Amino acid sequence: MQQSFSRRTLLRGAAASALALPLSGLASRRASALGRMEPIVSPYGKIAPVKDMTTGLPLLQLPEGFTYQSFGWTGDLMADGSPTPAAHDGMAVVRSRYVNGAPEITLIRNHENGIDTRLGLIKGAAVYDGAEAIVFEDQDENEATGPLSGGNTALIFADGKFTEARPVLAGTVWNCAGGPMPWGTWLSCEEGKYDFTDAGGKPHGYVFEVSPNAGETSAVPIKAMGRFDHEAVAMDPFTGALFLTEDDRNQAGLYKFIPADTSKKLGALEQGGTLWMAKVAGEDKVDLLTPSMGDSYQLEWVQIDDPDLPPQPFTEAPFEADN
């Protein structure tokens, strides 16, 4: 069954029912873990503090014989001389290759920053929203003034060693999670659906495709993927469909995006597509905040006619979790 609604109508009618739970496997694992009270013995032996090979600090506890090294600390200078941004969040290795006979991998990392004069705009990257004088007041009346400090950096490792970091995306807000694409890029998701147009900025709450190659990131939002508090995204390698999660407390949903351009290459997702939202089949307003172990639900997908519709307030209170 496939119906057609605006995202506003769907959220008002289905609210948290869209957060369908195909997670019974996880629930079963948790139930199994609760029934097993004896701790599992590690095959690697006991753990103890081990010093970081980069800083000399005992940051982790590991079994004997294990080593590690940290990299890309906040404030460390990147290849262009600018400081590494703060608030490291979602990341993934998007490319693995050989360069001059040696293995090289590239990791792209989110920086979940909002508006911050101290941090400033990430320099040297492709910029989506470069407004410098945005004033923002949150629901607790905390005020922030300055440029948008979210974005992405790319980190290069050659022959097992960290070699450099460089800025790749700037002018975004609250880049929380995202997901790697099979063709070697990263989708960076904004977890903030703000509109700074009145301050000379732009609307936010989008997904951006980030390339590991210098100069290839377009900083163009993929508006067809919807404007909401994005969390993560993953692609089904068999069908090419992308599945997106939302982090909006008790008002979140599960989405499916079918790209119009199926060439699976950099920039293809920017050509648009169709966005769908999940709901429990045949039912409205199903409270899924407090499921029982083993619960499962049959889903149906409802098409979102206008994925870029400005966020609308709920006309009814969202479900509240039991305390």
Ranges and model annotations:
Residues 2, 13, 17-323:
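Conserved small-residue
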